[in-house]
Regions:
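N-terminal auxiliary segments of SAM/dcSAM-dependent transferases
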Residues: 1-36
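Conserved class I S-adenosyl-L-methionine
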Residues: 73-82, 178-201
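Conserved SAM-binding loop of SAM-dependent methyltransferases across substrates and taxa
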Residues: 83-94
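Class I SAM-dependent methyltransferase SAM/SAH-binding core
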Residues: 93-129
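A short acidic, Gly/Pro-enriched loop at the edge of an enzyme's catalytic core
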Residues: 132-141
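A short glycine-rich, Lys/Arg-flanked "PGG" loop and its adjoining helix->strand segment in the class I
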Residues: 158-176
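Conserved small/polar residues in nucleotide/adenosyl-binding loops
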Residues: 210-212
Length: 212
């Protein structure tokens, strides 16, 4: 366990290597997070003209959670926090934020870009390992662009349902799960874009009720 600025970075469950990475560009992103203040990220994005840098550092990403009705007291668990693209939106409204991510490099990027925050803790490791050590109950648990990877990290016959069952154990009685995932009829497809993982049009989840 160590600190980057005020942020606690807990590597108790980290297995020593990053299994999910964008490659060498992450070294460049780490240098940006270390040496560039967030108010200058847009300038760097314009200069670099790099999709990963735009994707991970654009403040527009935070809009996906800007609607959440925070009062400043909530405890939030962000699963799959990556480089912290939406962590700032949570820190801006909630009382405490705990992040979980599989990648040490991405967690370091997240910690450096939010190093002034005194209410952020980042737990590095596979969710199935980390969640066994969670002692808190949360008002909100977020899965932003993460739920579709459940099959890769939840070892069971029905990984997506079991993923939700595991998460529910860590909610307060009136807590809520917030999921953002590709919508097969989303505006991006009507604009001609393809799905990120398969490269096809109109690919994604259909709205349905899952009993957990």
């Amino acid at each position: 366990m160590r600190k980057i600025g005020n942020v606690i970075l807990d590597d108790t469950c980290y297995q020593g290597r990053d299994l999910y990475t964008d490659g060498a560009i992450e070294d460049e992103m780490l240098e940006i997070a270390r040496n560039v203040s967030p108010d200058r990220f847009n300038k760097v994005i314009g200069e670099k003209k790099s999709w990963p840098i735009l994707y991970h550092f654009s403040h527009i990403r935070e809009n996906i959670l800007s609607w959440m009705p925070f009062t400043g007291k909530e405890k939030v668990l962000e699963i799959g926090s990556g480089c912290g693209a939406v962590t700032g939106a949570l820190l801006g409204g909630a009382g405490e934020v705990t992040c979980i991510d599989l990648s040490m490099k991405r967690s370091e990027i997240n910690a450096w870009r939010h190093r002034d925050s005194e209410k952020l803790k980042i737990l590095v490791g596979n969710f199935q390992d980390v969640e066994k050590k969670l002692t808190e109950k949360y008002d909100y648990i977020t899965l932003i662009g993460v739920f579709e990877y459940g099959e890769a990290y939840i070892q069971s016959q029905d990984p997506y349902v079991d993923f939700l069952k595991i998460i529910r154990k860590h909610l307060k009685p009136d807590g809520k799960i917030v999921i953002a995932i590709e919508n097969r009829f989303g505006l991006k497809y009507w604009a001609g874009c393809t799905e990120d993982h398969f490269g096809t049009l109109f690919e994604g989840i259909q709205l349905s009720l899952i009993h957990i």
